[in-house]
Design a protein with these regions (language model features):
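N-terminal targeting signals for export/organelle localization
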Residues: 1-41, 179
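A short beta-strand-turn-helix
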Residues: 29, 38-58
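Short loop/turn microsegments at loop-to-beta-strand junctions
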Residues: 35-36, 57, 141-143
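Short active-site neighborhood of thiol/selenol oxidoreductases, capturing the structured segment around
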Residues: 50-73, 78
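Thiol-/selenol-based redox modules, centered on thioredoxin-like
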Residues: 139-179
Length: 179
């Protein structure tokens, strides 16, 4: 019985602690702090710079992998709600460590018309505290940041349900824009 308990403890430690040891991420930017600036290629191959969106609200969402069930559901919901984001003067930008080619295929297959950004080296994901690096594999954690028109982080989400997340973000935008 003691052997089983010891094995369970070791497995739990490996599952929860090892990814943190290899994370490579910094802390998640706090609300009211400047959003880390970046320049990343989109699925179209053009550079997207955060500073170019000053004056608009930005929904910057990080996700693990193109064409996986949760990430596809989350992207679909952001796509369905694009008109609502436009009404709020907000732009949606998705970020993962996938390649430009992977993003291009994902957008074509799923009918996505907002920008997906390729953070292949993981630097931007790390700057936002959203990189998990396991050594042989790395991926972005499912985090979202609402960035206000002045370039400051207005709200962070570090626990995201891909199914209803877009609705939550829209409600938060409504609240934030009333302040």
């Amino acid at each position: 019985m003691l052997k089983i308990v010891l094995i369970v403890v070791v497995v739990v430690l490996v599952i929860f602690l090892v990814p943190r040891l290899f994370s490579g991420s910094r802390a998640v930017p706090a609300p009211d702090s400047p959003a880390p600036d970046f320049s990343l290629p989109s699925q179209e191959g053009t550079s997207v710079n955060l500073k170019d969106y000053r004056g608009k609200w930005v929904v910057l969402y990080f996700y693990p992998k193109d064409q996986t069930p949760g990430c596809t559901r989350e992207a679909h919901n952001f796509q369905i709600d694009q008109a609502k984001y436009n009404e709020r003067q907000a732009v949606v930008l998705g970020v993962s460590v996938d390649s430009v080619t992977s993003h291009k295929k994902f957008c074509a297959k799923e009918g996505l018309n907002f920008k997906l950004l390729a953070d292949q080296d993981g630097r931007v994901s790390a700057a936002y505290g959203s990189l998990t690096n396991l050594g042989v594999a790395k991926f972005a954690a499912r985090h979202t940041f609402i960035i206000d028109p002045s370039g400051k982080v207005a709200k962070t989400y570090t626990s995201v349900d891909p199914g209803g997340h877009s609705e939550d973000v829209l409600a938060a935008l409504d609240h934030l824009q009333k302040r």
